[in-house]
Amino acid sequence: EYYTNNLGNTLTLVDVMRNHGCKDIIFSSSATVYGDPDSLPLTEESPKKPATNPYGWTKWMIEQILTDLHTADPEWNVVLLRYFNPIGAHPSGLMGEDPKGIPNNLLPYVAQVAIGKRECVHVFGDDYNTPDGRDYIHVCDLATGHAAALNWMNGRTGVEIFNLGTGKGTSVLEIIKAFSRACGKDLPYQIDPRRPGDVDANYADCSKAKREMGWEAKYTIDDMCRDSWNWQCKNPNGYEG
């Protein structure tokens, strides 16, 4: 399904764009292309590594497809935005993440524990070599990152890569504590075995985005948890509720 949705639809989109003379594209890529990093923080020059899942492979491949597209036709203007871990919701509470079934992503799961739909948060492993965790970024910061990229790319051609993150790693336990502050109660959690493929830490160097586009993340982990909790309270059963 990832291959059909991501690869197939991207090829269709590029073909339509080419037929209509539109050669400017911003691609929502992912930090998954870096794999298990050799060193931190991750810069845009950090090596790409083989993906560990189909989602990561599609991002890896689409980056290559768009790079090849520019090589074949230098008039193309391609910006690859490598997201780290988008979380949060719009501060109004009108827009948020509404997973179907059991959430695969951390923050919606934590929010459902806080609202009483799940028993506890599962923390996979407490034996990491570093307390640092993943780089979480507020969805509103991603939106301003896209706006900054649109302004930056105007009149240019080429292929450019930008990391979008906060530059700080946050552990799952730190997320749980921050969400507990947001909802006003201690959230239950249990330590489970570490999952294969989980990395010790993964966070960005976003200095290039600040230097080139004038962009940097504004929201903190507490802001992300507050806005996610606000959305969950206004939509306890999701949009269909």
What label would you give each PLM region?
Residues 4-12, 19, 23-24, 33-85, ...:
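Catalytic helix-loop patch of NAD(P)-dependent Rossmann-fold dehydrogenases
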Residues 11-16, 141-144:
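Conserved mid-core alpha-helix of short-chain dehydrogenase/reductase
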Residues 21-25, 75-77, 119-120, 156-160:
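Active-site loop of short-chain dehydrogenase/reductase
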Residues 30:
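Residue(s) in the substrate-gating loop at a strand-loop-helix junction
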Residues 52, 87-103, 126-140, 168:
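Glycine-rich "substrate-gating" loop/helix at the edge of Rossmann-like oxidoreductase active sites
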Residues 93-121:
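Mobile, glycine-enriched helix-loop/loop "lid" segments at the mouths of ligand-binding/catalytic clefts
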Residues 112-241:
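C-terminal substrate-binding subdomain of Rossmann-fold SDR/epimerase-dehydratase oxidoreductases
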